Regions:
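Acidic two-metal-ion nuclease catalytic site recognized across multiple nuclease folds
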Residues: 3-13, 193-221
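Mg2+-dependent endonuclease catalytic cores in nucleic-acid-processing enzymes, primarily RNase H-like
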Residues: 56-178, 199, 215, 219-221
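Stable alpha-helical structural segments in soluble proteins, enriched in small hydrophobic residues
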Residues: 184-196
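Short loop/turn segments immediately following beta-strands, especially the blade-tip
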Residues: 50-55
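Short acidic, Gly/Ser-rich segments with clustered Asp/Glu that frequently serve as metal-coordination loops
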Residues: 32-44
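Peripheral docking tails and interdomain loops at the edges
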Residues: 178-184
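Acidic active-site catalytic centers that drive phospho-/nucleotidyl reactions
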Residues: 36, 100, 184-187
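ATPase catalytic-site recognition across NTP-hydrolyzing enzymes
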Residues: 1-35
């Protein structure tokens, strides 16, 4: 069964690209996936996006978790990730997934998965190294990002209707002192946030917003 695509890639007259969600009518600057496979428990995958325009009151862009999934079988897990990737990728483009490329177990599973896909003439599934993955402080980097973006009064991280917020609330109270992959939801979400937290438009914010508003009203650009 074909996967229905809900994202369109649009480009302003000045060349600034953005993603348009056909279901919610939201406009994103970037969409990425975060993927964590711990081997000993369920793997976790998230799709998240950062708003194109800044919230002027918070002086920050909202980040939205669009989808999530967890699976215990690696092949089923990777197929779910691929399905989500197609669902949230615009036509003729593929959003990137970020994960722990230093994990021997995960990379071996991924290599086997892709060997089968190549044998059948299907495009492989690629995972890009997540930000701060090799940094000594990575155990705190990802949880700190989640705490920062969910703090009262300045919340910019928003979740779809899933169990992820409840899981995170309980887990973030604990001291995460082991491998980040021991906490797949933290890892997968953290990988995505690490990318989206640094996204900026190529054009200056006021210029982009003004251009968009002129396009909407039909006034000359």
């Amino acid at each position: 069964m074909d996967v229905i695509n809900i994202i369109e890639k649009k480009i302003y007259a000045d060349g600034e690209p953005y993603y348009f969600n056909l279901e919610t009518k939201e406009k994103y600057g970037e969409i990425v996936g975060g993927l964590a496979w711990p081997e000993t428990t369920d793997g976790f995958v998230v799709i998240a996006a950062v708003d194109l325009f800044e919230d002027t009151g918070l002086e920050a862009r909202h980040i939205r978790v669009l989808a999530e999934a967890n699976e215990s079988d690696i092949n089923t897990f990777l197929r779910r990730a691929l399905k989500l990737q197609r669902h949230f990728s615009p036509f003729m483009e593929t959003i990137r997934f970020y994960g722990d490329t230093t994990s021997p177990a995960m990379m071996e599973f991924l290599d086997q998965f892709n060997r089968d896909r190549r044998h059948r003439g299907i495009t492989p599934f690629y995972v890009t190294e997540a930000p701060q993955l090799k940094a000594p402080q990575k155990l705190e980097f990802y949880p700190q990002l989640i705490r920062k973006y969910t703090q009262s009064g300045r919340k910019i991280l928003h979740f779809c209707d899933t169990a992820l917020p409840g899981y995170l609330m309980g887990l973030l109270r604990e001291e995460i002192s082991r491998n980040i992959l021991d906490h797949p939801p933290i890892a997968a979400l953290g990988y995505a946030l690490g990318v989206l937290s640094t996204w900026k438009p190529r054009k200056r914010e006021p210029e982009v917003r003004a251009k968009y508003e002129r396009v909407l009203t039909g006034n000359p650009v």
